[in-house]
A protein has these predicted regions:
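Immunoglobulin-like IPT/TIG beta-sandwich domains and homologous Ig-like subdomains
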Residues: 34-112
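Polytopic transmembrane helical bundles with strong interfacial aromatic enrichment
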Residues: 2-32, 115-359
Length: 359
């Protein structure tokens, strides 16, 4: 069955949409760093660096040190150097409720942004009964433009989410097709109940064997792409091209297992034995892939999202702005993989027909 032309246009449209918006969409404004890490009571002047911020064009910037939703210490912005650099002053009293504070800034363009790194205060008097100064009720609005969420470690590499993860989803879909076709090979292409010792009927089995092999071949391509994009992502977030993470090692094992599937197919020359052995091997390869990539990571600790205590696709991994690109990317790559599978299958059929003519 050929892939309908409308699905091909849909695939191309989705991938063009993803390629454009995955790169042109900016990250949300954030506070990147300050030259203060630890201060004492008194008057302090400090610098604050923003990321994708609009300190200058916003006009007015409200800056506070906060401990919780009921306590704040106002800071005075003394100079705005440019869109991402400002200088401010804060006066810390001798008596306070807490020793840990965080910066929060609000303006009309960036909305409300926070500095994740806490500011530690020393040499002060702890007074839990001190009257609290409520934080001003400014509007906690979002930035005025569409953006991706800012995450301190991932930062701009969050765009790789639109490529890395959909490639693995595509691989899974193709391997499911290969798994199902391998089962049909063992069933002789009929509706079950056949004795496995009965002679194989080539006209019933060969189409399913072709589909199993070609879907696994294209799936292996996306496995390699997933490993490459994952390694690049790891380099910029974890500081290394590869780490001893259970899911990363499991993905590499999956690649080796499926690469061995094609070595097995090429090693067996007798067609009937090749069909049987390849189908049995492919079924076990799929089960191993599920165990290594979907089951074991849930019970082990590691850096990769999806581990115990580090869930994938949580509210921190995938917000509404990311979903508008991620879901089309996933569907688009799955369509691309399915399209490649059909093309590879047609090429194989032509090659086999040519061989039959020469025989």
């Amino acid at each position: 069955m050929k892939m309908h032309i409308s699905l091909k246009f849909l695939c191309a449209g989705l991938l063009i949409y993803v390629a454009v918006f995955a790169f042109i969409t900016p990250l949300s404004p954030a506070l990147l760093q300050t030259n203060l890490t630890e201060i004492k009571p008194g008057t302090h002047t400090f610098e604050l660096v923003g990321y994708n911020s609009h300190f200058q064009s916003a006009g007015s910037n409200a800056l506070y040190l906060i401990n919780d939703s009921t306590l704040s210490i106002p800071c005075t912005v003394t100079q705005v150097a440019d869109e991402s650099h400002l200088t401010a002053e804060v006066i810390l009293p001798n008596e306070m409720h807490s020793k840990a504070f965080a910066f929060v800034l609000n303006n009309d363009v960036d909305g409300t942004v926070f500095l994740e790194t806490p500011l530690k205060v020393t040499d002060f008097t702890m007074n839990p009964d001190l009257a609290r100064t409520a934080m001003p009720q400014f509007q906690h609005r979002e930035a005025q433009f569409f953006n991706y969420p800012y995450q301190p470690i991932i930062m701009e590499t969050i765009r790789n989410l639109m490529w890395h993860v959909p490639m693995w989803f595509t691989m899974f879909v193709l391997m499911i097709i290969s798994f199902a076709q391998s089962i049909k090979v063992l069933m002789r292409g009929q509706r079950g109940g056949d004795d496995l010792l009965m002679p194989i009927q080539p006209e019933r089995v060969r189409p399913h064997d072709n589909k199993a092999a070609m879907s696994a071949a294209v799936g292996l391509v996306f496995c390699v792409l997933g490993l490459i994009t994952g390694s690049i992502w790891a380099r910029f977030t974890w500081g290394t091209w590869w780490t001893r993470d259970p899911q990363l090692n499991g993905a590499l094992v999956v690649f080796i297992v499926y690469a061995s599937y094609f070595i097995l197919r090429n090693a067996v020359t007798q067609e009937e034995n090749k069909w049987k052995l390849s189908a049995i091997y492919n079924i076990f390869a799929f089960i191993l892939m599920v165990v290594l990539l979907m089951i074991l990571p849930r019970f082990t600790e590691g850096l990769h999202p999806g581990k115990s205590g580090n869930p994938a696709f949580s509210q921190y991994d995938l917000d509404s702005s990311l979903r508008t690109i991620f879901y089309p990317a996933t569907f688009g790559f799955i369509l691309l993989g399915y399209w490649m599978y059909h093309l590879r299958l047609r090429i194989l059929k032509i090659e086999q027909a040519h061989e039959n003519l020469l025989a």
